[in-house]
């Protein structure tokens, strides 16, 4: 009877987690906010020599500081003017990412992983404040990281992780008030470092989370569409800013479900003062 009751509790917890995950996915998919990467448990989950493959997805938005800006103007192809561009905050940069995740257990308490996938970004009315909109195409994103467990007692694990990624967003910035679009190229490098805990029930369901550090660096280039002066001359302008995130510290919480032998699904929420994100993964160990 105790075994049946335990199995019933486990099945109920499994159904509850799946239901919560579905609600979270629907909620984020219908919200206005969309570029943090999913982290998963901050502890190693592979044995030595074991492999893992799967899919990661994240949907996030953040505020970015554009600083140390410069501009160059050309008149009929000849240098006309140059100088410093105004620094400002680019609000609600939205990005969705999808990765193929490949992992390997270097030891029972240490694993590494690589990610390759695509990303899509957008923002509204932030550079020129003239009802402009930016929408990138589907661009390349790559990343990788390490996880290590440094304490394990029963179902409780403590560990650390570090991961990084690079993504590019290229597309047009356009406004109904302009005669033609600008062309924007964004390169971003993100680093996340976390320390936290993972606790497992019945060997099937676990919760995890902890504090993390988030660092963003990169640059944004805006090539302004050519315009013709009153004298019939062609004016081209190029702007360039360095990118930083407003906030660097935050926290995250998630849950992981063993949906089948060797297959797990996890869902998580990350937040800082300037960013928030939803992440989900489905992974197979072999």
Where are the regions a protein language model picked out?
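Residues that define the transmembrane beta-barrel architecture of outer-membrane proteins
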Residues: 49, 94-98, 136-142, 185-191, ...
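Residues on the lipid-exposed face of transmembrane beta-strands in outer-membrane beta-barrel proteins
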Residues: 55, 100-104, 114, 144-148, ...
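Repeated loop/turn-to-beta-strand initiation elements of outer-membrane beta-barrel proteins
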Residues: 109-112, 153-158, 204-207, 257-267
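Outer-membrane beta-barrel biogenesis signature
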Residues: 27-75
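Surface-exposed strand-loop-strand hairpins of Gram-negative outer-membrane beta-barrel proteins
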Residues: 59-97, 126-138
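Solvent-exposed loop/turn segments connecting transmembrane beta-strands
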Residues: 92, 154, 243-247, 266-281
């Amino acid at each position: 009877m105790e075994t049946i009751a335990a199995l019933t509790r486990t099945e109920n917890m499994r159904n509850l987690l799946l239901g919560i995950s579905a609600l979270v996915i629907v909620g984020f998919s219908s919200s206005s906010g969309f570029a943090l990467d999913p982290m998963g448990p901050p502890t190693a989950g592979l044995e030595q020599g074991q492999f893992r493959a799967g899919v990661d997805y994240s949907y996030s938005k953040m505020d970015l500081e554009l600083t140390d800006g410069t501009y160059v103007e050309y008149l009929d192809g000849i240098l006309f003017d140059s100088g410093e561009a105004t620094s400002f905050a680019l609000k609600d940069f939205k990005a969705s990412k999808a990765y193929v995740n490949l992992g390997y257990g270097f030891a029972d308490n240490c694993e590494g992983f690589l990610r390759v996938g695509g990303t899509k970004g957008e923002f509204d009315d932030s550079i020129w404040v003239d009802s402009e909109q930016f929408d990138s195409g589907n661009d390349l994103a790559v990343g990788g990281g390490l996880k290590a467990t440094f304490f394990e007692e029963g179902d409780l694990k403590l560990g650390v992780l570090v991961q990084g990624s690079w993504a590019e967003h290229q597309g047009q910035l356009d406004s109904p008030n302009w005669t033609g679009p600008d062309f924007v190229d964004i390169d971003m490098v993100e680093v996340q470092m976390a320390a936290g805990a993972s606790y497992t029930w019945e060997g099937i369901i676990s919760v995890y989370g902890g504090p993390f550090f988030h660092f963003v660096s990169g640059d944004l280039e805006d090539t302004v569409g050519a315009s013709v002066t009153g004298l019939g001359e062609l004016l081209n302008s190029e702007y360039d800013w360095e990118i930083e995130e407003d906030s660097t510290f935050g926290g995250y919480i998630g849950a992981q479900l063993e949906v089948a032998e060797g297959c797990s699904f996890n869902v998580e929420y990350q937040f800082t003062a300037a960013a928030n994100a939803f992440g989900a993964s489905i992974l197979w160990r072999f």
